[in-house]
Swiss-Prot record:
This is Vacuolar fusion protein CCZ1 homolog. Residues 260-269 have a biased composition (Polar residues). The gene is CCZ1. Residues 255-275 are annotated as: Disordered. Belongs to the CCZ1 family. One of its GO terms (cellular component) is Mon1-Ccz1 complex. It is found in: Endosome; Prevacuolar compartment.
């Protein structure tokens, strides 16, 4: 496996390739759709992908019905994800003796799943792009700019910093919900009804966020997750503030080049690079706008991208409105928007005229009842709750997780790795039934690290300065489950 890692010392390698392409001798380069780093020598790219293809083929001999997920060698980990039929994504990361670089392969695979889901939401399936233009230049162009902009979030100086053991109490690929009272729920329902009628008889869909938490959605779970993920990355007030910081930094002389950005024929901002951080900001009217490359002369232009959803039958225009800590993501069926920009303007007017008071009232009530960044802190516990079926999670605030010792975090990260393996084995042996697990490990510094999986729901926690008996750990789980999980993890 040495060939795959000749240049890995420069950082992780991420590649996307199509096994249906480049099958003839001399055409191997045709199967490469994306490779990071982009300046990696072609021969090295071919050797990495050739090795990955060999591993996939070899694994299928022994397990034809299950995809290869991870291959560990002495110096590297290869994390695989078959994003679409015969279209593979592989992340190659170098192992080293630096404990700070310790990762969990399940978390790395989560990155591959996330970027593919986001890409598909904006550009459609990769296979569709390849069928539309068999030369693959269209697909390669979109993949290059989109993946480059996505990976920029992991930049640490000149290198990419992937999630490490310090992120073991986070779960990528889930939504974090805001808990609301019955009174507030009625306000949310009223607002959702108004948003749904923004286009008259045609029903619009919507997501409502408060800060970085989901308040309501009218979309199915998979589509909700993808749009929520994008909102957290680029659209919430916190994300837009980060966008502005990035833009200021770039204006001072540092630039990132990943390909051209164009404008569409109707004057709206191009969505060729929806993850380009410095382009988006909140306009004076409250709607998110895009600054053009000549914004000093022309000003901002409308930003209404078209999205592809997995479970919706129609493509949707996305319109984003903000009021203080509230973010409204309004989705308008593309087939129902006959007049283009005029139709979008009509929807915006309807929102401002009919929903403004609802939004102001809801924001006030949510702000009054909001406990701040530590709202979901539970004294004595550092925890992560995951419901994979609903794609929902809740976790201790990041600031509280940082108080855990390195040993506790490393122990919990290793435990999560073991649970990932057990879940994978259980799924292969019986995909129709969830297997329950409970593991309590005594770690250093009088700590317990705990994992419990019950009826598909998962609980991970670390308890420091804790009693040394197993009864102490079991009692702590029971108390937490009964008070915060409606008894979902209780033994009774």
């Amino acid at each position: 496996m040495g060939l795959s890692s000749a240049a890995a010392g420069e950082g992780p390698q991420l590649c996307v390739f199509d096994l249906r392409r480049g099958q003839q001798e001399g055409q191997e380069l045709d199967k490469i759709l994306f490779f990071h780093p982009t300046d990696c020598p072609i021969l090295l790219q071919l050797s990495v992908i050739g090795l990955c293809e060999g591993i996939i083929t070899f694994a299928r001999i022994f397990s034809p019905d299950d995809d290869c997920e991870v291959i560990e060698s002495e110096k590297h980990s290869h994390v695989f994800y078959q994003a679409e039929a015969d279209i593979w994504m592989v992340l190659v990361v170098e192992k080293n003796k630096d404990i700070e670089s310790t990762w969990r392969c399940g978390a790395l695979q989560g990155i591959l799943k996330e970027v593919h889901s986001l890409f598909t939401m904006f550009h459609g399936p990769i296979r569709t792009l390849l069928d539309r233009q068999p030369s693959a230049e269209l697909a390669r162009g979109h993949l290059r700019t989109f993946f480059t902009d996505y990976l920029s979030d992991f930049n640490a100086g000149k290198k990419i910093q992937l999630p490490t053991f310090r992120d073991c109490l986070k779960e990528r690929g889930t939504v974090q919900m805001l808990t609301i009272s019955r009174e507030v729920a009625l306000e949310v329902q009223s607002l959702t009804t108004v948003l749904g009628s923004c286009l008259g008889n045609v029903m619009c869909q919507s997501l409502v966020l408060f800060e970085d938490l989901l308040v309501s959605t009218t979309l199915p779970p998979d589509d909700t997750l993808n749009l929520y993920t994008y909102a957290i990355l680029r659209l919430t007030p916190r994300a837009l503030l980060s966008n502005a910081t990035s833009w200021s930094y770039l204006r001072k002389g540092t630039s990132v080049h990943a390909g051209p950005t164009s404008s569409s024929s109707n004057g709206t901002a191009s969505v060729e690079r929806p993850l380009q951080r410095e382009k988006l900001y909140k306009g004076k009217d409250g709607f998110v706008a895009a600054g053009s490359t000549t914004s000093e002369v022309r000003g901002a232009v409308a930003w209404v991208p078209i999205l592809w959803f997995q479970q919706a039958e129609d493509r949707m225009h996305l319109c984003v409105y903000q009021h203080k800590n509230i973010t409204i993501l309004l989705l308008i069926p593309a087939s129902s928007l006959i007049n283009g920009d005029d139709g979008i303007a009509h929807v915006k007017r309807h929102l401002l005229e009919n929903a403004s008071q609802n939004i102001v009232t809801l924001e006030l009530k949510l702000s009054r009842g909001w406990g701040g960044e530590n709202a979901y802190h539970v004294g004595g516990y550092r925890y992560l709750l995951v419901d994979p079926d609903r794609k929902v999670s809740r976790a201790s605030p990041p600031g509280k997780v940082t108080t855990l010792s390195k040993d506790s975090l490393l122990s919990l990260n290793r435990l999560r790795e073991e649970i990932d393996l057990e879940k994978s084995r259980a799924k292969r042996s019986d995909s129709c039934h969830d297997k329950d697990f409970e593991v309590c490990i005594r770690a250093k510094n009088n700590a317990w690290v705990i994992a419990k999986v019950t009826r598909g729901r998962e609980l991970y926690m670390a308890l420091e300065k804790a009693g040394e008996t197993l009864l102490y750990a079991s009692t702590a789980i029971e108390k937490f489950s009964n008070r915060y999980c409606e008894g979902a993890f209780s033994t009774d």
